[in-house]
Amino acid sequence: MLISIAFLLVLCLLNYSSFRMLKSFLTLKKISRYAYLGFFILLSAGEATFVFYRNVMPSHLFVLTSACSFVSFIAFVFSLSFYGFSYSVEKIDFLPSRRKGLKNFLRIGFYLALLGYFWRGFYEGLARPKIKETPIYLDKLDKELKIILLTDMHVGSLLQKDFVNYIVEEVNQKEVDMVLIGGDLVDENIEKVKSFLLPLNNLKSTHGTFYVPGNHEYYHGIEPILSFLNTLDMTILGNECVHLGGINLCGVYDYFARKRQDFAPDIDKALKKRDSSKPTILLAHQPKQIRSLKESHSIDLVLSGHTHAGQIFPFSLLVKLAQTYLHGLYKHSGTTQIYVSSGAGYWGIPLRFLAPSEIAYLRLLPKNQA
């Protein structure tokens, strides 16, 4: 609760700052001033509603109120930029007529930049995810292994059965050895999305489909979600490990649940039955789960999602601070690598900026082929 309140206070501070910065440079009539004030009040009210009632509100309100935090951050970034330019113009020794002309130019530029930002953001957000191929070289691997990593599909009120069907069709074209679903598959009460998820039974691969939950599964009821997913043609790796395709494939529950009594991540338990002669792949929703690794764990590759590659720049800079790894393949330490997918779907409004969605196609190759 304290974290939620702190998060809300930060958002309200951003809203207040944006309000003050823009107000000092925008010329508003009386009616416009009330509308301007009302916009920021509604924005803060939406954020408060989301923070305190997100687990019980209807899906359409969840999407609407969650989007308010994105709007606050974007408004703050643009307001700060506009304020900085306008303040500089005021301080430079221009002729009054030139200063006025430059301020008008900046104002028009601000509106055009804002329009272009949202146009590009919605274009990327609504675009269907494309397959992105990445080669990864591993020690102790005998032969090539082809993997599809699906994360952050966020199946719910906006991303429904047609979206899942598209994903399945794209995946099946690659004829891979296994399909891994790295969490945040469900973003709605499971009773409302069961039919949307049924096409996942049509995923084709040599060894099958494997899944770990993300934080959004906990938001919407982890037990009923896992109960339903157990009826589908997939294996849930909840702190468990399987041996197939010449690797140890291990999975853990999400980092979000680390303080829970049940469905909490336990890396030691997940690795208990692995074969040390084979490379070990750990499927964990959040990249920062890697901070829990010890040298003795000897993980070769961690596969994660959660970040959406930041979803909207420059929000991605804050995500990187929180998660360390944002998107793509990284060398963590020693022999441990981590791949973070940008995700196939989106959270909140369909907006992505400089963070396109993806279906990650990972070609695991013996290191001697590098």
UniProtKB/Swiss-Prot annotation:
GO CC annotation terms, alphabetical: membrane
User: Which cofactor does the UniProt annotation name?
Assistant: a divalent metal cation
Top EC category: hydrolase
* Keyword Metal-binding listed: yes
From the Swiss-Prot or TrEMBL record, what is one GO molecular function term? metal ion binding
Q: How is the cofactor bound?
A: Binds 2 divalent metal cations.
Q: Which residues bind a divalent metal cation 1?
A: 152, 154, 184, 308
EC no. given is 3.1.-.-
Per the record, the similarity remark reads: Belongs to the metallophosphoesterase superfamily.
User: What keywords tag this UniProt record?
Assistant: Hydrolase, Metal-binding
Q: Which GO terms describe its biological process?
A: lipid A biosynthetic process
Task: State the InterPro entries in the record.
Answer: Calcineurin-like_PHP_ApaH, Metallo-depent_PP-like, Metallophosphoesterase_sf
Q: Which organism is it from?
A: Helicobacter pylori (strain J99 / ATCC 700824) (Campylobacter pylori J99)
Binding, a divalent metal cation 2: 184, 215, 306
Source organism, top-level taxon = Bacteria
| Name of the protein in question | Uncharacterized metallophosphoesterase jhp_0380
Keyword DNA-binding, does the record have it? no
